[in-house]
Amino acid sequence: MVNRTSPMDGGAEDSPPEGHKWLKVNGVVVGTVPITGDPEMDLIVAREFLDKRGLRPPPPTKLQSMFRQAIAFATVSRDCHEMLNRQPRNPVYAAPFVVNIAFSIELYLKTLAEAHGVTPWGHDLMKLYEGLPGAALAALSKVTPHVAQSEGLAETSDVGDALANLRTAFVDWRYLYEKESTEMVHIPSAIFVARALHEACLASGIK
């Protein structure tokens, strides 16, 4: 392990040795590796360094990868929503918001189903929802009232009802410029669904 104040780095706390870069695991510096100038080779060198020291984190499971990707698309949709709310309003962010939140919902639904032993397919959100096993629906129903209330909606708000408005949104809104019109999306309901599914995934033990 390389100490940030060791002679190796010339005494500079924030600078690695010349021609090297810091290597971190979970935000902690564990050493330095040479910069080869080739990104792929740099990755190989870093992996070898970590493997030799038993520091390389285990790869995520399929379920973890699905959940993290759902979170990533939900995060992008949140950023688009923030842009939509800025003044003066710019409606150009509406389509990216809908596409990203719809896809995040699709991934959350598939993640939740996978966590309970079902591997679903397709983009139709209602079909994915209707295909959830009982245990997944139970996990979702437990978190729904609290999430609805936190989003300013009635505690009796239903995920299925909200999904009826979103079922083909991912497909319909990707090429919005090619259409004269498309079904409007109720933004608060879309956010409610994404958050409820996120919480249901957490409640199902997915991290």
Q: Which residues does each PLM region occupy?
A:
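Short, surface-exposed helix-loop/turn micro-motifs enriched in polar/charged residues
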Residues: 89, 96, 117-121
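Alpha-helical scaffold segments that form or flank carboxylate-/histidine-based iron centers
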Residues: 91-103
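Short, contiguous, well-structured surface segments enriched in hydrophobic/aromatic residues
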Residues: 53-88, 107-110, 114
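Long, charged low-complexity segments
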Residues: 4-7, 11-71, 117-207
